[in-house]
């Protein structure tokens, strides 16, 4: 990892990098996503869940010049090859939108988790960009660590999902997207796996 603006926790590594994405790039990503949003589902679920209230869409890394540049910049910060990352996911949370406490990593104690890991590898790193400032609410909370990150346009939040040198879930990586109370919240996320995705 490159040296962050703010190191929030050491194990798992949780850190923020300020002004990584420009205001123009944030606006372009929002504009690209606006007309493509679908109701979000929880990983592994087949229907809309009350756990997650948002809309999302996905972009291949080379689908647009701004998408490519932002994705390459993030990969250079986390020091993982970009082809180890899933497509870029852009999400909008309106007032009342939230994502209850969850893990981004796949559960090695379930058949679905083991199957997914064998096929595409574990999600090792989460890299989340805040695309706008939120009027009220919408923080990213790590409840077991009492760490709360306020959305700030262009800031990148990076955290490890697994124990050091392992694909086993780090229990302190549990996090949630707090309720948006005013305005809306836009984020873009890359999940980096332990093996190539393409």
Each language-model region and where it sits:
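Fe(II)/2-oxoglutarate oxygenase catalytic core
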Residues: 1-198
């Amino acid at each position: 990892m490159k040296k962050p603006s703010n190191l929030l926790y050491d194990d798992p590594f949780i850190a923020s990098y300020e002004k990584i994405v420009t205001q123009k790039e944030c606006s372009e990503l929002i504009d690209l996503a606006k007309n493509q949003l679908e109701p979000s589902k929880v990983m592994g679920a087949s229907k809309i869940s009350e756990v997650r209230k948002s809309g999302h869409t996905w972009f291949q890394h080379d689908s647009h010049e701004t998408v490519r540049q932002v994705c390459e910049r993030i990969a250079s910060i986390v020091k993982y090859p970009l082809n180890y990352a899933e497509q870029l996911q852009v999400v909008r949370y309106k007032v009342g939108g939230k994502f209850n406490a969850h893990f981004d990593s796949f559960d090695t104690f379930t058949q679905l988790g083991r199957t997914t890991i064998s096929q595409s590898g574990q999600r090792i790193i989460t890299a989340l960009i805040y695309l706008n400032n939120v009027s009220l609410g919408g923080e990213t909370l790590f409840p077991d660590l009492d760490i709360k990150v306020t959305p700030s346009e262009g800031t990148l939040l990076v955290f490890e999902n697994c124990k050091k040198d392992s694909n086993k879930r780090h229990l302190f990586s549990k996090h949630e997207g707090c309720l948006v109370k005013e305005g809306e919240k836009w984020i873009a996320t890359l999940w980096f796996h332990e093996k190539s995705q393409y």
